[in-house]
Amino acid sequence: MNVSILLEHINKLTPLNHAFEDDSVGLLIGDESNQVENLTVGHELEESLLEYCKDNNVDTVVTYHPPPYKRIVDENDIETYLPDPITKSFVDSSINVISIHTAQDVCEEGNAETLAELFGMSNVSIFANSVDNFGAGRKGKINKISPTDLKKDIENKLNTKIIRTNEYFNEIKEIQNIAVLPGSGTQFIDEIIYSVDVFITCLLYTSDAADD
């Protein structure tokens, strides 16, 4: 099949037009007429993935994160974006790259819904909307739990030991209302700050976490 047919299959699972407007999704390196003989998936473009593609004759990669570009602002404040070395390496190697990024976050049975199910949330509602009723965040109720036990629960369910909290986290006596959002939740704090006890997300800028 060619890349255009692969994109049709991807759109059935993860509609790319549901991604955030400013997000880079879809075919970002390559051409829709290119043939797909060997396909792999990855979280993001990196050297180990490139070597795997070369060693296994992989011509097409579906990633979560889009290929990285570097923003350059000249003396006249004109912006240009140059491909990072790893992006250029995939271009030079003629490997098609398709990114699903926030389309995967907001879709049915996507990252946001998976997190809500993982934490056993009930009375779930959507926030951080991209288009229509699709959104990257979920908020709802869980069984009452202490901060210490919630932290352990996050570590176990997400298989991580790298958890950072703000200074108020351990002052909470009991947690029942939570919000979850894959990726960076910084810009969506105002949507949930007064309706949940804890916001679980991948990234918050320090000033936002400290102030809220």
In which residue ranges do the predicted regions lie?
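Hydrophobic structural segments
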Residues: 1-208
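Disulfide-stabilized cysteine-rich extracellular repeat microdomains
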Residues: 211-212
